[in-house]
Amino acid sequence: MQAKQRFTNVTLVTPIGEKNQDLLVKDNLIVDIVDRDSSVSDDFHIYDGEDNYIFPGMIDVLQHGFLNYLYGHAEENCTVDNAKLLPEVGVTGFLPSTPCLPPEQTRELLNNLSNDIDKSKEGSRILGIHSEGPCFALPGAHNPKNLRNPSVELAEELIDATNGKLKAVTIAPEMEGAEACIKRLKKDNISIHLGHSGANPEDVPMFADWGVDAATHMYDALPTYPADDTGVHVLSLTDALIAESRIALGLICDGIHVHPQLVELLSHLPSDRVFLETDSVKGSGSPVPVKFEFYPGRWCTVEKGKASTYDGLLAGSSLTSIEGLQNYLKYSKKSISQVSIAASLVPARVIGLDDKMGSIEKNKFADFILLRKNDLEIAETFIAGKSVYKSD
């Protein structure tokens, strides 16, 4: 690896627009953005970007698995192994996410994932852990037998089991004990995501006051309501989330979980309100169908772009981050710079890391992907200024 690199013949995708300038990287950081005809010291290695985009590395804050692993199965080195493969789909940072398990299994899984973070030295950055549950009002595909009530004690149990590496928790905030649980988690700067919830829509501003700052998989496991018998459209939970500017909205942009026209509707919000997440499970990214046991007796299949239980219930997704980017660009009709905010910058901000990553800006990590302009496929992925994946 060259200690100093100058990426030229590229278009930089930044939060404020595209820039036909050169990117200077020293060691693991972006140190400057300069005009193409500007002179810099001779010790910068010239890298020809072949007229590709330089797009910020994508950050997936909800990921239950990828290819051969489901993180809930607690297989040794599962996240370490996947970290080496995720650059192929444009992911430079992610939160392995946990399902609803019995208490002892939850503690063991969280501890194992925490240890994996310490061991991981190659590939995508494992940025922390996302506990999706166990405090749900609506279980979705999760095991309803493993749901628990929120409490301060549970919050501390999750924090302790992850050795301080807990970055996000999805919770139904209408449950008894949720306020105290949320406020305890916020003391450790943990992002609180409303999800699997049937909360009163009028309570959403109060939840934001408590510390809820995001919504998990918008429109999914969040009930909407039709017009009432008099023809009045009542306020739904998703309406209230859209209206609450303090809450960022997580979106599984596979064209299955959320109708493309609803994606376009969300895209009219300010760009910093929406972020892309995959909710991917084992088998995502696989070219062949994959079957697995989500929990004892609950079998799932991943095929034809969809992850579902044998009885047809959606069970996460088979989406990859690069597919989500491509879909969001198509459905939202936003510019590629605006899409980069949803794919990279807002996820980083949600988990408190936007000062270090999430955009092509000076003094941030040199984590980015070279995207071909003609088809938006990945040509190469760089993490800390080092090439970690290159397409054939």
Task: Name each model-derived stretch.
Residues 50-108:
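Metal-associated gating/positioning segment near the N- to mid-region
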Residues 64, 85-95, 139-162, 206-248, ...:
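Active-site gating loops and adjacent loop-to-helix segments of metal-dependent hydrolytic enzymes
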Residues 62, 131, 185, 215, ...:
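Conserved, mostly hydrophobic/aromatic
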Residues 156, 160-287:
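Active-site core of metal-dependent hydrolases
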Residues 1-40, 375, 382:
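N-terminal metal-binding scaffold of metallo-dependent hydrolase/deaminase domains
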Residues 37-55:
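Active-site metal-binding motif and surrounding structural segment of the metallo-beta-lactamase
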Residues 233-249, 267-278, 284-364, 368-371:
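His/Asp/Glu-enriched, well-ordered alpha-helical/loop segment
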